[in-house]
Swiss-Prot record:
This is Homeodomain-only protein. The keyword Ribosomal protein does not apply. Disulfide bonds: none annotated. Residues 3-62 bind DNA. Atypical homeodomain protein which does not bind DNA and is required to modulate cardiac growth and development. May act via an interaction with SRF, leading to modulate the expression of SRF-dependent cardiac-specific genes and cardiac development. May act as a co-chaperone for HSPA1A and HSPA1B chaperone proteins and assist in chaperone-mediated protein refolding.
């Protein structure tokens, strides 16, 4: 059973990921995720995992549960 090796993003990759998270979209759609993955050189799975972990960190820093649904009117 093959498992994907955990990869720590480089400083340059982190800059791209953080920029997209903070300035573009905290919830990228599949097309955007694919473009970010291509730009960083990471796999789509690695990129998605990073966004999920980063979103949980952001939610915690904002005093929100790390996982919950969207707030809707």
């Amino acid at each position: 059973m093959a498992t994907e090796k955990s990869v720590t993003p480089t400083e340059e990759q982190l800059e791209i990921l953080e920029y997209n998270f903070c300035k573009v979209n905290k919830h990228p759609d599949p097309t955007t995720l694919c473009l970010i993955a291509a730009e960083t050189g990471l796999s789509e799975e690695q990129t998605l995992k990073w966004f999920k972990q980063r979103l949980a960190e952001w939610r915690k820093s904002e005093g929100l549960p790390s996982e919950c649904g969207s707030v809707r009117d």
